[in-house]
Amino acid sequence: MMQNDLSVFNEYESEVRSYVRGFPTVFHQAKGYKLWDLDGKEYVDFFSGAGALNYGHNDENMKQKLLTYIQEDGVTHSLDMATKAKGEFIDAFQNIILKPRNMDYKIMFPGPTGANSVESALKLARKVTGRTNVVSFTNGFHGMTIGALSVTGNKFKRNGAGMPLSNTSTLPYDQFLKESNNSIEYIENFLDNGGSGLDKPAAFIVETVQGEGGLNAASSEWLRSIEKICRERDIKLILDDVQAGVGRTGTFFSFEPAGIKPDFVCLSKSIGGNGSPLAITLVAPEYDKFAPGEHNGTFRGNNFAFVTGTEALNYWKDDRLEKNVQEKSERITSFLDDMIKKHPEMKGVRKGRGFMQGIMSPIEDLADNIAGRCFEHGLIMETAGAEDEVFKLFPPITIDDEGLERGLSILQQAIEEVTAESNLVAK
Amino acid sequence: MMQNDLSVFNEYESEVRSYVRGFPTVFHQAKGYKLWDLDGKEYVDFFSGAGALNYGHNDENMKQKLLTYIQEDGVTHSLDMATKAKGEFIDAFQNIILKPRNMDYKIMFPGPTGANSVESALKLARKVTGRTNVVSFTNGFHGMTIGALSVTGNKFKRNGAGMPLSNTSTLPYDQFLKESNNSIEYIENFLDNGGSGLDKPAAFIVETVQGEGGLNAASSEWLRSIEKICRERDIKLILDDVQAGVGRTGTFFSFEPAGIKPDFVCLSKSIGGNGSPLAITLVAPEYDKFAPGEHNGTFRGNNFAFVTGTEALNYWKDDRLEKNVQEKSERITSFLDDMIKKHPEMKGVRKGRGFMQGIMSPIEDLADNIAGRCFEHGLIMETAGAEDEVFKLFPPITIDDEGLERGLSILQQAIEEVTAESNLVAK
Amino acid sequence: MMQNDLSVFNEYESEVRSYVRGFPTVFHQAKGYKLWDLDGKEYVDFFSGAGALNYGHNDENMKQKLLTYIQEDGVTHSLDMATKAKGEFIDAFQNIILKPRNMDYKIMFPGPTGANSVESALKLARKVTGRTNVVSFTNGFHGMTIGALSVTGNKFKRNGAGMPLSNTSTLPYDQFLKESNNSIEYIENFLDNGGSGLDKPAAFIVETVQGEGGLNAASSEWLRSIEKICRERDIKLILDDVQAGVGRTGTFFSFEPAGIKPDFVCLSKSIGGNGSPLAITLVAPEYDKFAPGEHNGTFRGNNFAFVTGTEALNYWKDDRLEKNVQEKSERITSFLDDMIKKHPEMKGVRKGRGFMQGIMSPIEDLADNIAGRCFEHGLIMETAGAEDEVFKLFPPITIDDEGLERGLSILQQAIEEVTAESNLVAK
Amino acid sequence: MMQNDLSVFNEYESEVRSYVRGFPTVFHQAKGYKLWDLDGKEYVDFFSGAGALNYGHNDENMKQKLLTYIQEDGVTHSLDMATKAKGEFIDAFQNIILKPRNMDYKIMFPGPTGANSVESALKLARKVTGRTNVVSFTNGFHGMTIGALSVTGNKFKRNGAGMPLSNTSTLPYDQFLKESNNSIEYIENFLDNGGSGLDKPAAFIVETVQGEGGLNAASSEWLRSIEKICRERDIKLILDDVQAGVGRTGTFFSFEPAGIKPDFVCLSKSIGGNGSPLAITLVAPEYDKFAPGEHNGTFRGNNFAFVTGTEALNYWKDDRLEKNVQEKSERITSFLDDMIKKHPEMKGVRKGRGFMQGIMSPIEDLADNIAGRCFEHGLIMETAGAEDEVFKLFPPITIDDEGLERGLSILQQAIEEVTAESNLVAK
């Protein structure tokens, strides 16, 4: 396949295919924040594989480690047997990530996807409590398998199940309720009122920033209140850090600024370093209660991802990457504020934090149109929210100033063009 | 990590870890049917990553293709955007696999695991029929996420869900009923009797050989009857070929000898060629009814697996591999029959077909003890069945005579030792 | 309303009305085995309110007791407060029924219907075991509320729920499996096989004779095997004696001949004596674990039914009624055998036992046509089975020879007419 | 049983018994608003069988009609066959209740309890919409069978199910949310936000005044908003008028002042006139879609209740009863306001409307203690709310001034005594 031709996809791939519709070209090569299609056209990547490519494409150090590993016939696939590559990953994760943060968790390899991690945490929280209900939050997004989909708020996605999704209750996320600044009182009321119909949950599952749900960022105070609510009622706290974790918000775990200690932490996406499938579930030792093999899966031992994932952890040995993200986050924030001010016709609201920010607009199709215009001009960027009402800046966290400015510049141009041309109609 | 030391796993990994307990060593390198641990000890692999390594470890052609791809900074991770590597995989699958078999299916990339494929098929079958119940079979095994676990028969695994698993009904697999040769009459009776309590199912989900469930092989006649039952009642047929597919039974799809046409086919494990996470769901075009993005997932676009998976398909351009499997299957069969005859104290029954055969024994711990002894003597082999009552020969389908005989010889020694030493007690 | 006119029903009552369609007349008075409509036409009642009128209509002793009670302004409605009428009922039930049979049960008043009794037993069995699954049997019928409907086999009724019915599994009733004489081996296999997908049940719920399900009568041996299966596995046994109990099969409890001791017994229908709404749940003392008020209901204290129900228990102070039923059952049996022999074109099979016998015929509409013809000739009789394939003789158990013969004679005439006229076609 | 002795209840009745614990005496006779126990002690009844005795005990007209009916051997039990008594009930209900209110409903007889009516409406709403989710409200109470319990908010009761209750979502009732005057905005937000996780419901089920849930009275405006929400989204509206209906709030249907037109109305409790088990479901003709027999039940045809229920409808031929209730409601309101003012230590809040009013107090056990003291002084009154935090005045709606004042006077005395003696501690 040497031609930039989508016909093989159009003809043979299922209708469910999605991103290829928004980015209709055949990509071939990628490095850092850049992608090239088969025509050689270069794209700036403000999408980062929906958070799976936080370190950019084909990081050179990871690449070299992986090439050596493959060259030497290192074990590729190992289920949950012990391998040198896996041992080194565990060791690095323990010593670079957990210990310096005074975190004490058992590491579970639940299968290679974020949904696997979510499913394992849900199962374990139910098992250790003997309760079946799990509280999730409005606009939460946790995956497409039935267990994970049951705690996902998006109705279009839920509808794909073809059957009722049960054993879950949705409560309002931070700022979902319009009349108050937070939803804590409402949540406590539902939990404690003996007539609320909310069966005592095994766990809460929560994201610190809802990446798919529209870049809703919970405040640290809200997160601490949620933790307190759980602690006081013996409810387990599952922190789904699949999209917001691994540095995207400026710290390795997105919940570090809030200072909370979840009982379960779900990690995936960028944990493998280069976008290779890998997920882990961190489990507080007292809840590490699955019997051997009670949860399993074929691809728990993806050694390529162990190799690149281990190399990636080196980014966290000092605070340079953290600082880079935090500094550039401010640049993104000020850029977005500026756009909102310059284009009041967008009726834009800035959303999110760190390297997961964007603008929500009530204008019909605006976010989609801007993302589409960006693509034409060589910038990959996606939308988020139940109605795709947010455009979402997700650059690699390793991006340099040049890359960031190049992307922002294209985005600015797209905003200007779309707002100028469109007959803007609020939804 | 240069020492063969399990302490990092024992200390930091979750108790749910399983295979590392049966094979307590740190593996490092692997090639074809061989594995080496950090002490340099060589093992023959009759396990094949539970079916994910049908082509053996680090096949040289795949390895070279992959090295080149990585060297050239080919796209690693792409969600469901179009990439050259993905396009070539689709093209090869279409032209090498589907077209020559006169099969007309849309290819869905549901996420990288077999469970993802199963979940996508279950969701779609329910969606297109508007029915919620799905019939699965005794000892069926389809995965650990809630949707897939709901159709899995193993009670120990089901118990891990921590909640009731619903919208499924289990019916007896071929030869599960003792008094009759097949279960077809029973199934028809339950479906058609207006008082059986079996709500009309959206689909049947079935394996041709139950790999995890104890190497139960359905007859072609039974499979055709199941297809007929479905057709006559407008019930969709989901064929889970995750473990038995990709050549393990001697044909690419395990259901080819039966001549049936499932509505959905689940493939994973060896579809990526070298054990890299990849899964596809084949969907009859008339049921390709997910809206764009209605089912999604981060790791649908694992390009390393596309590269190696495409290369692997070359094995199917002629019939050499098929013939190799079919011939060596006969050797395995006669070896197992021989063992059963020589060691009547095992009360062994040969199970399975092709390169997924083994011996079921009612003797307490016998299968486990034999597998343990094999490991000591340098052969990796696992057990199967709800009570681990079967030891299971799963050599790579590319194995040569020397490898096969070496493995069988170790197995023979293990059987002889265990049966000689043990105080055999039937369960 | 003095005219025999159905227009008020046709115009204002819901389409769900059913018996009025088969017996299209307006009834007014009734005594013993006789009913009269507004035209004064007399009918013999071989229907007995589907088992709620085992003692016939308006038994004179009950009537007098009730008239006095009402005349004296006895408490009519009392929830679960103590009343004289309730105390006397409990006392009589204890002394006339339980003690002489060496039965030790707590009496629960779960609401006035059989479904209330079933729901209370299901809830309690789940609560005391901490398990959610309940095993029911093919063609079992337990009621229309969601809990009771979940354990009912009839698909037409289940479909009325408008949602999936969960937490139940159906296993084959005695003689449902065609190839064997009983289903015990199959049931044990499903329970004990670790891969059967049958989650360990809280309870089995079973009828001794399936009145709605087609007059399937379980053998005493089968019932004892079911009890043994439950005992050996710590599964609770719920005996639904709503239709077969209170003397219909010749003993007060239908399970007396089998000699089993259920953990929960559901009674309703004729327990109130004259067809007034009343139900009780007998609970083995060790499982009497509902907290006060954890299950409740407005009509638990129907004192009219306590009064008539207490009077009805006097029938059980000696064995005259039992003997009457047992003797007349033989007459019914021989009559039905004779009909089957004389009319082989019915392809009839005799079903049931005691005063719940009938003939199953595979001939399209035969049972319905015979019941319809009986109605024309002055006999009320209904059909049963998922396809209404059985006509069902349900005379009052207090019927005398004259009444029985009169009914049988009408039935014989109907059979002769229908078999003579019809173009009989097997389904 | 001639002695006022509870031993038969204590010894033989299940522990689940409840009211007998609060009112520990054996009642025997009753008339109007009076009850007598076996010692001849007289009690004023401010309980009215939890709403089943709205017309008081043994109303003389109903009694005479019933005596005549029984004397003449009228049909007692008739399933859903046509009887004279049933026809007259339908006719009266149509002509006295529905027609004058311009209401067009089919009448369904779903079984004799409120829960039967609720279950039938839930099933039918799901069936006609093809959706499974039903929205209920905080502190709603609809019954103890699994379908009805699933829409009941009380956690203690829900826990009795022993299994997860699914296919329902709870939303905040009027004034449940503290920060705003009504919950309408919140509800609309949950329904319309594509990410709220609230699957589109088949129906809302709502009470106008939550009798068991703590006498929460929805405003007419709130009810109209709920109706509007349903209409605009094609959601069915089920009005559970089991407790608040049949005159308890001053109009026959409690929703008359709000002017709404529910799709389904559930009636029971006092619909039978004298506390005999009877329930009806009113179904908008376009949703009368059960097939004949798709929902059934043994005690749908309780003719005694038809006779007394028909007689009771005569109370609604003119507006005297309505006026009586409305006038005396004002007396109750002013009495309660006065008590709250005189006894600020109760921290009382008046709740409810019409003849279902009471006082909520946060003081630990206050409501229970007052009800207990009332009983000692000869007044029957119960508590309500998830924590029994409300005492609840439920006199017969036919009560005269003397009876009302006598009851209020006892209540006043009890309040004075309890507040004087108690060491009042807020919960």
UniProtKB/Swiss-Prot annotation, chains A, B, C, D:
Keywords from the UniProt entry: Aminotransferase, Pyridoxal phosphate, Transferase
GO annotation terms (biological process): ectoine biosynthetic process
Residues where N6-(pyridoxal phosphate)lysine is found: 269
GO molecular function: diaminobutyrate-2-oxoglutarate transaminase activity; diaminobutyrate-pyruvate transaminase activity; pyridoxal phosphate binding
Cofactor(s) the protein requires to work: pyridoxal 5'-phosphate
Pathway: Amine and polyamine biosynthesis; ectoine biosynthesis; L-ectoine from L-aspartate 4-semialdehyde: step 1/3
Stored SUPFAM superfamilies: PLP-dependent transferases
Taxonomy, superkingdom: Bacteria
Transmembrane segments: none
InterPro entries: Aminotrans_3, Aminotrans_3_PPA_site, Dat, Ectoine_EctB, PyrdxlP-dep_Trfase, PyrdxlP-dep_Trfase_major, PyrdxlP-dep_Trfase_small
EC number(s) on file: 2.6.1.76
Gene3D superfamilies noted in UniProt: Aspartate Aminotransferase, domain 1 (3.90.1150.10), Type I PLP-dependent aspartate aminotransferase-like (Major domain) (3.40.640.10)
Stated family: Belongs to the class-III pyridoxal-phosphate-dependent aminotransferase family.
NCBIfam families: dat (TIGR00709), ectoine_ectB (TIGR02407), PRK09264.1 (NF006733)
PANTHER family named among the record's database cross-references: DIAMINOBUTYRATE--2-OXOGLUTARATE AMINOTRANSFERASE, DIAMINOBUTYRATE--2-OXOGLUTARATE TRANSAMINASE
Name of this protein: Diaminobutyrate--2-oxoglutarate transaminase
